[in-house]
A protein has these predicted regions:
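Leu/Val/Ala/Ile-rich N-terminal alpha-helices, chiefly Sec-type signal peptides and the beginnings
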Residues: 1-54
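Charged, low-complexity interaction regions
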Residues: 25-34, 55-59, 129-140
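Short, charged, amphipathic alpha-helical segments
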Residues: 34-38, 61-69, 137-147
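Membrane-proximal, non-transmembrane alpha-helical segments
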Residues: 104-177
Length: 200
């Protein structure tokens, strides 16, 4: 493929893949991550060098290759930011529901699926981090897979949000019943011990 077609392919990737990812990062984090600025600047810098007067075809090819690596790096950084943001969403859910019996949601089907997806997402991110130093394309696929799993997990969490209040009430009632039973058993054992003391 000649240089112009490769540059067009780079801009096509930028417009169809990177821009939507950046928009999602901005929507989730309400900021534009600094590493993305640097990578985007470097991408455009290498493309601009392709048009320097007097550059040989070999030099242009080298600059395009560097730009292609920056495109992959931008996608990696976007998926890392998105996975981190989604993980924070999961942690917030866990913090908000730490006093909730999650096993009763969706007739008991929510919690096993939740734990499975959470574990799968975390393990996939770990594998991607290990792969990143050896094979960036494979790491990119793993980060994308992790993003999809986290997205499924977030949808699952969103589906139970209305039921969490009911589960919280149930948990509170169960806890109150445990306390009342403990108090009743303490009072009963006190009465029985007084009664037995009077008998003997």
């Amino acid at each position: 493929m000649d240089g112009d077609k490769r540059i067009i392919a780079l801009y096509n990737d930028y417009n169809t893949i990177i821009k939507p990812l950046i928009a999602e990062v901005e929507a989730r984090t309400e900021q534009f991550p600094l590493p993305l600025f640097n990578e985007i600047r470097a991408l455009h810098d290498h493309i601009a060098r392709c048009y320097v007067e007097g550059f040989t075809e070999v030099q242009v090819d080298a600059e395009i290759h560097k730009a292609e690596r920056h495109v992959i790096r931008i996608m990696l950084d976007c998926y890392k930011c998105l996975n981190l943001s989604l993980h924070d969403t999961v942690l917030l859910f866990e913090k908000q529901t730490r006093h909730v019996d999650l096993t009763v949601l969706h007739n008991g089907t929510f919690y096993p699926k939740y734990k499975s997806l959470r574990t799968q997402a975390i393990q996939t991110v770990r594998k991607a981090k290990i792969l990143e130093s050896m094979d960036t394309n494979a790491a990119l696929d793993m980060y994308q897979t992790a993003h999809n799993v986290y997205g499924e997990l977030e949808s699952l969490i969103d589906s139970v949000t209305p039921d969490v209040h009911w589960a919280r009430v149930r948990f509170t009632i169960r806890r109150a019943m445990q306390v009342l039973l403990w108090i009743a058993s303490a009072v009963a054992s006190g009465i029985i011990s007084i009664f037995l003391t009077d008998l003997f």
